[in-house]
Amino acid sequence: MGIPESKKSIFLRSVFELNKNNCHFDYLAAKKDAGVGFMEYTEQINIELASIHYDFLTDFGKKELTFMLAYIHQMMEAKRVSNLGPLASILMIYISPEEVFKILKLLVERSDKIKMRDNLMHLRNKLGWHVATDEDDHAQLISTFIDSYISLKKNGNRRQVLVKFYELQYNFDFFVHQMMNSLLTVVIPIDFAIPVIFNYLIEGQKGIFKSMYGLIKSNKQFIVSLSSKDQLM
């Protein structure tokens, strides 16, 4: 059982693309549509998530992430997923690029599709400078935001990543604490990091969203500086 093939592409879009009106994710409806055996995949993913860092997410965000990973797992088992790029872009809204690669690697290792293995290696090369960071470095939120922003830019949905972060209610207190320990400079230049930090401390959660979005929108060089490891600083 599961989703009829005729509705597969529609369901994928509804699950993995952000709703430009409210970014709403109907977990119960999506789980129902996914089929009777879906809970087995959810249980498997919950075990694997034990090794993944997602400290910024609330319980609601963790539920979304669990569902998406389980659905990807189910699709890969059925050999209906051949392009990991779009999936990686969506997952980077929830977890850092390093963690995205880690979880996709776990999933792909179970696949007998050589094409998918090659695809994963290409993805690793693309995300290479992210993957190279320290495994315990949680201050990846802004780099995740930048990557997601760039991936959605062509579709005119730049603001929706911002809305999604707000809906998930990231733990910004923890995020700022990590930034104060200089971890943010691993991700972006310090002259961009400082204004974001102070904007948050003064105005709170809404302020950091305004600051991040403003920086990205008005500084093309900021985006360019994050496009390669050599240009980070």
Regions found by a protein language model. Name each.
Residues 1-233:
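Helix-rich, well-folded core regions that mediate interactions or catalysis
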